Amino acid sequence: HSEGTFSNDYSKYLETRRAQDFVQWLMNSXXXXXXXXHADGTYTSDVSSYLQEQAAKDFITWLKSGQPKPE
């Protein structure tokens, strides 16, 4: 892959992974009856940090697996 294609594929992968993780996180949060209240800024920052970290871990795992990119 050229660097531009790799970056584009990586961005698409991260967007998809973040969306999946966020939906899963919401579903898990909805299952818990007691939810801790956060200020909107803190909540958004926490979710973004979690999703970025998780997407990076998943991408590294995917790179190590040598699998072709998902279409």
Swiss-Prot record:
GO BP: response to starvation
Task: Using the UniProt record, give the first listed, main subcellular location.
Answer: secreted
InterPro entries for the chain: Glucagon, Glucagon_GIP_secretin_VIP
**Where does this protein reside within or beyond the cell?**
Secreted
Q: What is this protein called?
A: Pro-glucagon
Q: Which UniProt keywords apply?
A: Hormone, Secreted
What does the further note read?
X's in the sequence were included by homology with American goosefish sequences.
Question: What upregulates this protein?
Answer: Produced in the A cells of the islets of Langerhans in response to a drop in blood sugar concentration.
> Per its record, what are the GO molecular function terms?
glucagon receptor binding; hormone activity
Q: Spell out the GO cellular component terms annotated for this protein, sorted alphabetically and separated by semicolons.
A: extracellular region
What is stated as this protein's family in its record?
Belongs to the glucagon family.
Q: Coding gene?
A: gcg
Organism expressing this protein natively: Ictalurus punctatus (Channel catfish)
